[in-house]
Design a protein with these regions (language model features):
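C-terminal catalytic histidine-bearing segment of alpha/beta-hydrolase fold enzymes
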Residues: 124-176
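Conserved alpha/beta-hydrolase "acid-adjacent" motif
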Residues: 116-125
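Short beta-strand/loop motif that positions the catalytic acidic residue
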Residues: 103, 108-111, 115
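Catalytic nucleophile-loop/oxyanion-hole region of alpha/beta-hydrolase
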Residues: 1-28, 152-160
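Primarily recognizes the serine-hydrolase "nucleophile elbow" in alpha/beta-hydrolase
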Residues: 12-74, 91-92
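Short beta-strand immediately N-terminal to the catalytic nucleophile in serine-hydrolase-like folds
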Residues: 33-35, 110, 185
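Mobile cap/lid helix-loop segments that gate and shape the active-site cleft of serine hydrolases
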Residues: 64-99, 105
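Serine-esterase "nucleophile elbow" of acetyl-processing enzymes
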Residues: 175-210
Length: 210
């Protein structure tokens, strides 16, 4: 596929969030991006590759694919994004642990130790890149849970993870006290997947922007 499409879509989402900040009661300088698994690679790509005006202010990454190094990436993500015969230069460009700078936004990173789909080394090396560049970051590796636990109610560390995430979000000051902290832009969130009365209860509807 065309790897520029998900990147341009995510950049458009960031632009829409910032352009709509007044209407949605958001602080345009306190908007984060969140992604899981392959979506974590997209989120970390936006955090490390985009222009300053489109860059998120923080990133939340659950069991993310970070690297394109074939020795420890998720091969399906590598092949879908870059192709099976990607050059070393292209792999380096999209190995986000190698693209961190001091301008990369702060990060919350979480894995399970027994994740057999995306090796936690992805997040460990990303954390080390952030730490080397003096970017605030936390890395949580829970004892078990495998991969994809973000959508499972039976994840035994669910409450611990939510407490860790809440504490991290509280640990840095929101620039404006009365602003909504996080905006979620994406089909399942904005459209209101699994919400019976989307026209009334979806996020944009509640804010009065539908």
């Amino acid at each position: 596929g065309d790897r520029t499409l998900p990147i341009s879509d995510a950049e458009a989402a960031m632009k829409m969030a910032r352009d709509s900040a007044d209407v949605w009661n958001l602080n345009p300088y306190d908007i984060g991006i969140m992604g899981s698994s392959a979506g974590g690679h997209l989120a970390s790509t936006i955090a490390t590759h985009t222009r300053p005006e489109l860059r998120p202010n923080f990133q939340i990454l659950f069991y993310p694919v970070i690297t394109m190094d074939k020795s420890y990436t998720h091969i399906g993500s590598h092949d879908n994004l870059l192709g099976k015969d990607a050059s070393a230069e292209l792999e380096t460009e999209f190995s986000n642990e190698k693209q961190v700078t001091k301008e990369t936004p702060r990060a919350f990173i979480a894995y399970s130790d027994d994740d057999k789909t995306v090796p936690p080394a992805n997040g460990v090396n990303y954390y080390l890149g952030l730490h080397k560049n003096h970017v605030p970051a936390v890395l949580h590796i829970y004892a078990s849970g495998g991969h994809g636990w973000g959508i499972r109610e039976n994840f035994i560390y669910k409450n611990e993870m939510l407490n860790d995430l809440s504490a991290w979000l509280r640990s840095f000051k929101a620039p404006r006290k009365d602003a909504v902290r996080v905006v979620c832009v994406g089909n399942s969130i904005t459209y209101g997947a699994r919400i019976k009365n989307r026209s009334h209860d979806s996020y944009p509807a509640v804010l009065g922007v539908c």
